[in-house]
Amino acid sequence: GAMRRAAGKFLTVVMLLATLGALGLLGRELVQHFQWCIQAETVRFTESADELRNPDRGVYAIYGFRIKEEPVDYAAELAERMKEDTDTTLAMLQINLQEYRGGELSSAALENIENLFRAISGTDKRWIVRFLYDWYGENEQYEPQDIEIITGHMKQLGGILKTYKDCIFTLQGLFIGNWGEMNGTRYADQESMQQLTAQLLESTDETTFLAVRTPAQWRKITGTADIAGADGEMTRRLG
């Protein structure tokens, strides 16, 4: 009995040593494999006071354009106005549609707007874009009397906004309010803001984000599911 127990212990030790040996060989093979696959480079960093041109952040200048019938060389005008703006990665574009508050955008207006977007797409910045009807804090004098005119403008602009989506950082506001800031507007009720948001979502690429002024406005717009099929898209793209 004693010899049998001793033999059993000896066999256990032998099996354990064999297992450890096999694991050791396997581990060595794995180490060699990963050493072969992974390459590392030693890098030494030093402190610097240089400003980094991180994208989509920081201070920005505002560039406003009032759309009219006359053709404009926006590339030349923008280049002149931006010649001192060399250290930023963002800019704001305000597009005033006041001349067309009574009806649809003309073909000349659309051509001017497209030329303006073509000009900003040639810059080294991404753009916060805001459409508006008022620059004077007197929105009720200049805002369209019928919401269908505003949604009509959004529809007309859809092709341009989708074509130049890559230069748009965000679309700010819903075209309404003093300075386009969504205050002092007759369209502040939930139904109107949802209607405007739904149309602007439809008129823009799915990668374009929209922004409203306050959390209360965001909750008012997204708080119900009255707009069939749009509520999920709305909450994903609206900030």
Show the residue positions of the predicted features.
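N-terminal Sec-pathway targeting helices
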Residues: 1-19, 23-26
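Membrane-interface motif at the C-terminal end of an N-terminal transmembrane signal
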Residues: 21-38
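Aromatic-lined substrate-binding rim segments of carbohydrate-active enzymes
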Residues: 75-134, 147-150, 202-208
